Amino acid sequence: MLKQIAKFFYNLLPLKKYLFFLVRKLFLPTQNLYQHLTFKGIFKVPVGNKKIKIFHTGTILENQLFWKGLEGYEPNSLKIWLKLSEMSNIIFDLGANNGIYSLLAKSKNPASTVHAFEPVERIYKLLKKNVSINDFDITCHNKAISNTDGMGFFFDDDEEITTSVNVNMSLSEAASYKGVDEETLHRVETEIITLDTFIKEGNIPKIDLMKIDVELHEPEVFDGFAENLKKFKPVLIIEIIRDYVGASLHEKLSGLGYNYFFINEPYGGVDHPIKGEAYQKVDTLTGGRYGNYLFCSNDIVDELKLV
């Protein structure tokens, strides 16, 4: 109750945005402090000699970007994503959230075609807002990529901005995954479509680069991509947070000429050790090392000098 009261009065404070802009110019607070210094409004993130605009809703993702720029959120993933975007013509962002990956791709390669998919309607609206304030030509889709076409569902909470929903996962599984009581979740219907169907209906000639962050639904995504995966063989960045997902992806991608790299983010802790190369070549996708992985051909390995 005290925490809620404090948050209520904090939200009433005027001019927080401008105060934090001033603080950021003078010094960088510790993470323990700045994680509490949030506001609502537009801010800019430097991307090379350009800047992109992000609408801050108060999430950790946006706060990290505000205080530390691209070094604050998945820096090694974003760094290689920018390089890959520059080399890619058609880019897909599955589980786009606020659109940071899509925005960076378009900023780095304005001539590229970018498709962003986000099934949660209020997050989709935020995605659209970020695309609009940057005046970017990014095609946004309020649907989920899955293994069938039609309607699916997910269990959502009442948080203004949610960071994870699990398509077609049971209520008990969703509650366990989110670490909340079942009573706090409600069922939401959403349109689902396979990549193969989307490619056919949209006359998509190829996919060069794809980011997939769909909260354990990755195997179903690839089940619906079987027809075109072998033909397109896109470069992939995929979040793997369970061994069974890694094992399934290894089975589906083996024999297609992909190299696997664990993207080692500098956050410390068990899953993301501070020491080590940023992109570590691995032979397996299991073993409890969770985070983002890069999947690419020998040509990409050579061009980016990954080994």
Residue map of PLM features:
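Short internal loop-to-helix segment that lines adenine-nucleotide cofactor pockets
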Residues: 68-92, 168-232, 244, 248
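S-adenosyl-L-methionine
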Residues: 1-120, 125-193, ...
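Internal alpha/beta domain cores that form substrate/cofactor-binding pockets in large enzymes
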Residues: 117, 195-200, 205-231, 235-237, ...
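Short, well-ordered alpha-helical microsegments
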Residues: 99-102, 124, 148, 218-219, ...
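Hydrophobic packing residues within well-ordered alpha-helices of enzyme cores
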Residues: 105, 127, 154, 221-225, ...
